[in-house]
């Protein structure tokens, strides 16, 4: 049953992809505006359905971070609609071309951006991904299969109804955006075998989900891996600036992948900065896990071993370590970072440039909060995820990351000798 359903869903999506691949930017934008309008019109219904998911999640004991991701408020529903309108304002990359070469025989060689085809998005308690991914894939000329976790299934279906309303009003097949009707693991496994119809899989979620999808899929996978993001306070840091960025990165919103999970402090400024951090983090009720060189600065902190870092807390918790020097910070990040986002605070331009050049992560920042590691904040509009895979996309994935390039060769009757 699951095998047949997975094949049917994938086949319908592949057929629908052909319908959207050739739409003009003007036509796609008109449909997207209808999607935004439909989400606004259905706000009350979406929130009502979401309350059922929240009640179920509470009964099942979901973590505070998961519940935060799951919850839809009027502001968040409006945010989904606004994100679609931001996508409308973005230039459509499909059809863009550039000349590579003109051969001696007169052939013209170009490369042109084209849609990927069918994208399968697998995610957990993030109903907003339904709207974001649906709109991004549509604008980039792709069909999308959305498989959300059981935590958000009803909310995602309600959002999909709004998107389908816009598609049907535009005489387009609903299969352009498909929400898998059940979170059944067997069905997901079968979807990951549909290499004849699905072109790319993007998982967003916990470590277990990412590993399962990567190990099971016969289709190329771009991972949205966990966010173990670090803040390194250099010996030449502005400490007031560092404190503000620490608090923003750790406490503004904890259950997101661009929140800070690790604090590294150069030993030359530890005596001054760590007491500042201890006071400010205590006021925000942040639990501290610190190495033996740092633990005494914090009341009630627990000491952790040197090999116990690298945890994605997604809560008011942070790991703290004092490092000997810049090289010590880099070594720590290389060992315990997840390749998501890393931040340095320093007034030394050469050190900042070196950090940006040497740190191996999808996003590297100097003197700004990790919370800006987000497609919308970086000018991409809504993002489909933050890739930690070094494939054609690395970092926040906007429209262009959902396309590929093909060669276009034009001539005037040339034949090969």
Curated annotation (Swiss-Prot):
The Gene Ontology CC terms held by the record are:
cytoplasm
- Judging by the UniProt lineage, the source's domain of life is Bacteria
User: Which Gene Ontology terms cover its molecular function?
Assistant: glutamate-5-semialdehyde dehydrogenase activity; NADP binding
Alphabetically sorted, this entry's keywords are: Amino-acid biosynthesis, Cytoplasm, NADP, Oxidoreductase, Proline biosynthesis
Where is this protein primarily located? cytoplasm
Presence of the UniProt keyword Cytoplasm in the record = yes
A family per Pfam: Aldedh
- InterPro entries reported in the protein's UniProt record: Ald_DH/histidinol_DH (IPR016161), Ald_DH_C (IPR016163), Ald_DH_N (IPR016162), Aldehyde_DH_dom (IPR015590), G-glutamylP_reductase_CS (IPR020593), Glu-5-SA_DH (IPR012134), GPR_dom (IPR000965)
Q: In which pathway does it act?
A: Amino-acid biosynthesis; L-proline biosynthesis; L-glutamate 5-semialdehyde from L-glutamate: step 2/2
Give its localization. Answer: Cytoplasm
Single GO biological process annotation from the record: L-proline biosynthetic process
Q: Which CDD domains match?
A: ALDH_F18-19_ProA-GPR
Report the catalytic activity.
L-glutamate 5-semialdehyde + phosphate + NADP(+) = L-glutamyl 5-phosphate + NADPH + H(+)
Which EC numbers does the record give? 1.2.1.41
User: Which family does the similarity line name?
Assistant: Belongs to the gamma-glutamyl phosphate reductase family.
The function of this protein is:
Catalyzes the NADPH-dependent reduction of L-glutamate 5-phosphate into L-glutamate 5-semialdehyde and phosphate. The product spontaneously undergoes cyclization to form 1-pyrroline-5-carboxylate.
Q: Which NCBIfam families match?
A: PRK00197.1, proA
- Record protein name field: Gamma-glutamyl phosphate reductase
Tell me what organism the protein belongs to.
Idiomarina loihiensis (strain ATCC BAA-735 / DSM 15497 / L2-TR)
The coding gene here is proA
């Amino acid at each position: 049953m699951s095998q047949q359903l997975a094949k049917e869903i994938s086949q319908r999506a592949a057929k629908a992809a052909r319908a959207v691949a050739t739409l003009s930017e003007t036509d796609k934008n008109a449909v997207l505006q209808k999607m935004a309008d439909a989400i606004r019109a259905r706000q009350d219904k979406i929130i009502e359905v979401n309350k059922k998911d929240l009640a179920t999640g509470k009964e099942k004991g979901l973590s505070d971070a998961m519940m935060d991701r799951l919850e839809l408020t009027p502001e968040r529903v409006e945010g989904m609609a606004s994100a679609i309108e931001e996508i409308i304002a973005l230039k459509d990359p499909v059809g863009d071309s550039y000349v590579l070469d003109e051969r001696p025989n007169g052939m013209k060689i170009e490369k042109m951006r084209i849609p990927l085809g069918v994208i399968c998005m697998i995610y957990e308690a993030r109903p907003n991904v339904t709207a974001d991914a649906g709109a991004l894939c549509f604008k980039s000329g792709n069909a999308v299969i959305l498989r959300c976790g059981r935590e958000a299934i009803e909310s995602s279906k309600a959002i999909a109804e709004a998107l389908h309303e816009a598609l049907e009003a535009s005489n387009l097949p609903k299969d352009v955006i498909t929400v898998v009707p059940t979170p059944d693991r067997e069905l997901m496994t079968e979807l990951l075998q549909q290499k004849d119809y699905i072109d790319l899989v993007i998982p967003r979620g916990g470590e277990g989900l990412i590993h399962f999808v990567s190990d099971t899929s016969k289709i190329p996978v771009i991972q949205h891996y966990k966010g173990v993001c670090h803040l390194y306070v250099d010996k030449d840091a502005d400490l007031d600036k560092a404190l503000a960025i620490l608090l923003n990165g750790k406490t503004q919103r904890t259950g997101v992948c661009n929140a800070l999970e690790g604090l590294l402090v150069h030993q030359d400024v530890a005596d001054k900065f760590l007491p500042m951090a201890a006071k400010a983090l205590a006021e925000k009720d942040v639990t501290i896990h610190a190495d033996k060189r740092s633990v005494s600065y914090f009341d009630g902190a627990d000491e952790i071993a040197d090999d116990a870092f690298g945890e994605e807390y997604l809560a008011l918790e942070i790991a703290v370590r004092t490092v000997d020097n810049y090289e010590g910070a880099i070594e720590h990040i290389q060992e315990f970072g997840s390749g998501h986002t890393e931040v340095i605070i320093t007034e030394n331009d050469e050190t900042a440039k070196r950090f940006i050049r040497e740190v191996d992560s999808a996003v590297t920042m100097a003197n700004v909060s990790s919370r800006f590691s987000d497609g919308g904040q970086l000018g991409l509009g809504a993002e489909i995820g933050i890739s930690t895979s070094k494939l054609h996309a690395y970092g926040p994935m906007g429209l262009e990351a959902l396309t590929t390039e093909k060669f276009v060769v034009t001539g005037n009757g040339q034949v090969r000798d």
